Design a protein with these regions (language model features):
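Binuclear metal-dependent phosphoesterase catalytic core
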Residues: 123-126, 223-278
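His/Asp/Glu-rich metal-coordinating catalytic cores
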Residues: 50, 61-221, 228-230
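Structural beta-strand/beta-sheet cores of well-ordered domains, especially the beta-sheet scaffolds
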Residues: 8, 162, 203, 218, ...
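A structural signal for the main folded, soluble domain(s) of proteins
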Residues: 31-32, 37, 146-152, 252-257, ...
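Short, conserved loop/turn and helix-capping segments at secondary-structure boundaries
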Residues: 30, 65, 191, 235-239
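N-terminal active-site segment of His-dependent metallophosphoesterases
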Residues: 1-70
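Flexible, active-site-adjacent loop/turn segments at secondary-structure boundaries
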Residues: 8-10, 14, 190, 195, ...
Length: 278
């Protein structure tokens, strides 16, 4: 049985432009980095064999060098394979962070366990087959998973679980229901049609872009952000976790959220009986 951690939307370098207090912005940014250490702790605690990042590891395609070095050092400390696809914030177009010589040099030095998946083709691991569906531009009206419809599944090892790793919205959710990224909403772009995928050939669909915990189907999940990034908007708003996933070929995945968030965002309401109360 394969045991992995499904994460997404780390968004290292997020500016928190709506937070006026400079010290609070800095604290929020530091907690996003610290959450990577808590992902490592969960991986050790549950003897995970690999970590998935379903897009938006960075908040932009040109993050600050200090943030890049810090997160690479934290990823290197995980000491497990960390498989990453570009999302809409850190898409994989030429000239972006992933293609820079300095990033690639630092990655080799600090995080040799980071495996960037920018090609839409099967990746064969010892424990699984990963089917990456990276975003290669910020907004794309084509389905990043469309390449899977033409895949010859008979060429894949029959005994290994198959994992789709994708970033984007899912067909079937309206604009009010889709609570992805308020800074870069997906809208009609980057939409994934899960119904077009051959369900019997896929064991787990690891999604990113939705900032809340969300089960889309028996095999498809969004983990939400590992560190909360905004005020709660109701009981359905569950942030600050990763997903522990246990997989076997041909079986339904066993999925359990594991806490990684530290900060709590609270909405406070006051009722005044009269103007004199102020």
């Amino acid at each position: 049985m394969l045991r992995l951690l499904h994460t997404a939307d780390w968004q290292i370098g997020k500016p928190y432009g709506t937070v006026a207090d400079e010290q609070k912005r800095y604290r929020l940014q530091q907690e996003r980095l610290a959450a990577v250490g808590r992902i490592r702790e969960q991986a050790l605690l549950h003897s995970a064999q690999l970590v998935l990042v379903a897009g938006d590891l960075f908040d932009s395609t040109a993050p600050a060098t200090t943030a890049v070095l810090e997160v690479l050092e934290s990823i290197g400390a995980i000491a497990l394979p960390v498989l990453v696809i570009p999302g809409n914030h850190d898409h994989g177009a030429p000239g972006t962070i992933w293609h820079r010589d300095d990033f690639q040099r630092h990655q080799r030095q600090l995080a040799p366990n980071l495996q960037l998946l920018v090609d839409r083709s099967p990746v064969l691991l010892e424990q699984a087959v990963v089917l990456p569906c990276p975003l290669l531009r910020n907004q794309d009206n084509s389905d990043p998973c469309a390449w899977l419809q033409a895949l010859d599944w008979s060429t894949l090892p029959a005994e290994l679980p198959r994992i789709v790793l994708a970033h984007g919205g899912v067909h079937g959710f309206g604009g009010r229901d889709y609570d992805g990224d308020e800074d870069a909403p997906a809208g009609a772009n980057n939409l994934i049609d899960l119904s077009a995928l051959p369900a019997s050939q896929i064991d787990y669909i690891a999604l990113g872009d939705w900032h809340n915990l969300k089960q889309v189907s028996e095999r498809a999940w969004y983990p939400g952000t590992p560190e909360p990034d905004r005020f709660d908007q109701g009981d359905a708003n569950q942030r600050g976790q990763v997903l522990l996933v246990e997989l076997e070929r041909g079986a339904l995945p066993q999925v359990r959220p594991q806490p990684t968030g530290r900060l709590r965002w609270h909405n406070l309401r006051f009722r005044f009986s009269s103007t004199s109360s102020t």
